[in-house]
């Protein structure tokens, strides 16, 4: 087929050259285009010492081209037969006779592998795992299967219905204490204690903030008047307090502190 397309392209090139530059009277080539592209293609092929190709049946022409190349003709109406003939030419077994599973199994057999599919994909998967030296996996319960896989890896099974217990078991495997028993505050405090920090929340967020500040070496901050607290903070950091009632004065004071 590629040869046919090449020939047509050659003919087109010859024809275009003919139009672009008419041949002189002394040329041994015939003029080309008289209205029938097939006749013209055949004339061009004849000039090249090749047989004409197209007389109306593309299959016959393809087979003729294959014959020119020393190959057997291929297509007589049944693409499967033709494919099998091509495989035979390459020294391969034919593949498809109507049952794709049989064909797949035949291919696996060629590779020295056992056939796989007889109707139950789980059985087939297990058979494949067995071939690899692994245990079968799925019998209906994904949790049991996961645990079996973990056991194969030398790990303990994990999930028996309570995700918190399972999380704690995992933490225990890592040498860590379990965390959650129902009270997130207690758990947070336990975690802080593990890190060498004091527990924090006991009901009053202001007390907790002050407790944090004290732990860091700062005095507690909020006792009811946010302006007083800001002034105390500014004083502690060596900055003079800013706001006494007039925001413009405060802004100007801030600018003055910056040398502006």
Curated annotation (Swiss-Prot):
<keyword id="KW-0964">Secreted</keyword>
<keyword id="KW-0732">Signal</keyword>
<feature type="signal peptide">
    <location>
        <begin position="1"/>
        <end position="20"/>
    </location>
</feature>
<protein>
    <recommendedName>
        <fullName>Repetitive secreted protein 1</fullName>
    </recommendedName>
</protein>
<comment type="function">
    <text>Repetitive secreted protein essential for pathogenic development. Hum3 and rsp1 together are pathogenicity proteins that share an essential function in early stages of the infection.</text>
</comment>
<keyword id="KW-0843">Virulence</keyword>
């Amino acid at each position: 087929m590629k040869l046919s397309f090449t020939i047509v392209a050659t003919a087109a090139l010859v024809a275009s050259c003919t139009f672009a530059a008419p041949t002189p009277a002394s040329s041994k080539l015939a003029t080309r285009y008289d209205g029938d592209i097939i006749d013209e293609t055949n004339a061009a092929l004849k000039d090249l010492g090749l047989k004409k190709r197209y007389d109306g049946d593309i299959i016959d022409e393809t087979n003729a081209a294959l014959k020119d190349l020393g190959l057997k003709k291929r297509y007589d109406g049944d693409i499967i037969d033709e494919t099998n003939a091509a495989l035979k030419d390459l020294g391969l077994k034919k593949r498809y006779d109507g049952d794709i599973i049989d064909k797949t199994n035949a291919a696996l057999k060629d590779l020295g592998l056992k056939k796989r599919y007889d109707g139950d994909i789980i059985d087939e998967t297990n058979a494949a795992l067995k071939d690899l030296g692994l245990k079968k996996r799925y019998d209906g319960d994904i949790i049991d299967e996961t645990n079996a896989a973990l056991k194969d890896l030398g790990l303990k099974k994990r999930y028996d219905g309570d995700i918190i217990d399972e999380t704690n078991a995992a933490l225990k495997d890592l040498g860590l204490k379990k965390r959650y028993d129902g009270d997130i505050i207690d758990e947070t405090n336990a975690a802080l204690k593990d890190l060498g920090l004091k527990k924090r929340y006991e009901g009053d967020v202001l007390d907790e903030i002050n407790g944090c500040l004290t732990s860091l070496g700062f005095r507690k901050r909020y006792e009811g008047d946010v302006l007083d607290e800001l002034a105390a903070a500014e004083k502690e950091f060596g900055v003079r307090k800013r706001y006494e009632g007039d925001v413009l004065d405060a802004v100007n004071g801030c600018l003055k502190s910056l040398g502006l």
